[in-house]
Every structure is written in structure tokens, then in C-alpha cells.
Amino acid sequence: GFAILTSSRVEIEQNTFKRYTNPNFNIPDETTQSQTNQKSDLGLLKLSAKYIPDSSNQLDYEILGRLTKEDQLQLFNSSVLGSTNQNEQATPYSVNQNLNYYYTLDEKNIFAIEAQHLIKDEDPFYNAILEDKDNYENTALALGLEPSQLNYDVVQEKMIFSNQLDAKLDYWHILSPKSDLNFTFGSILSKQEFDSDFYQYLDSGSIFDPTPEINDGY
């Protein structure tokens, strides 16, 4: 087996200027500035084992675990839309296991079992602070945000959990050195859970659950 640990830090600065030469578009010129800090940490672990007690039996096992921590902070300023602070975080992980078993009953009958189990968890987090409220008045109204705050501090959280098992059984009956019969039986069991939440931080530090006015609140 092996283990891998990696870490990276990236800083990005970008300045843009947009000028619209056709006044009939009625679109104002825009200057934007953005500063982005990205952090990423990754851990990877793989272990494998093989067991052969005799010439008729063989067992192979492998497990691969992966854990990631990601964080991105962006400070964005627009001469048209104002200032926005955005923070994105995620700590996804996955565990993948493989099991293979081979059994030779005799010269004419061979069995093989293969199974794979995967667990995956994802939890993306997004937070945006919109300092110039007037530029987002229509959007805030549609989302049902509380307008009496100093700014719009909104959060979206998601939770995605996946659990899947794949397994199959193979049987070979040897008829001759050049021909055989093969029968395969397999199954896939899969389950996924999804949850999402959207809310607003108020100036007092409390949490407000808005009711959107679009799509009848859904």
C-alpha cells in the first residue's frame, strides 16, 4: 500500500475593464477587481492484501481512502454591482473497497466472486456577503431575504451521501481444453441521500430561513 499527503496554496488577482462602444445597449462600463485565495489539502491511503492458503483458494482485498479539504475565499469588487465576499468550503471523502475470491473445486469447476463497495460523502458550503444591497433588491425579494439588514449574508449548504455495492459470481465449467460454459450472476445495490439548505445570517448573528416568492416557494 501507500499514503499520499499533498497541500497547495494559490493566490490569484485579476483586474478587468469593460467598455461598451454602442450607447444604444444602455449598459454602463464596468471595472472589476478580484482577489482569490485557494487552499487544498489531500490525503490518500491505499492498502492491499493477498491470501493464498493453497492451490485452490485465493483472496485479494484492496481499500482506497481519499479525504480532501478545500477552501476558497474571493473578494470581488465591481463598479456596477459593488463589493461581494464569497467563501466556498468542502471536505469530501470516499472509501472504495474491492474483494476478489477465486476457488477451484476441481479441474472442471471454477468459481470467482468479485465485490466492490463505495462510500462517498460530499458537503459543499457556499457563503456570499453582498455589501451593496440596492443592486440585488429584485433578487433578494424573489428569494425572500430579510431586507432590513446592513448587507445580504447568505449561505447554501449541500449534503450528498452515496453508498453502492456491486457484486457478481462467476462459474466456469470446463468442457475441454478449448471450450467451457460460463454463468454470471450479479447485483447492484445503490443508495443516495441529498439534502440542501439555504438561509441568511442576520446582523444579530441569528439565522433566518427565507421563503422564496418564485416557483411558489419551492
Language-model-detected regions and their locations in the chain:
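Primarily recognizes Gram-negative and organellar outer-membrane beta-barrels
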Residues: 1-218
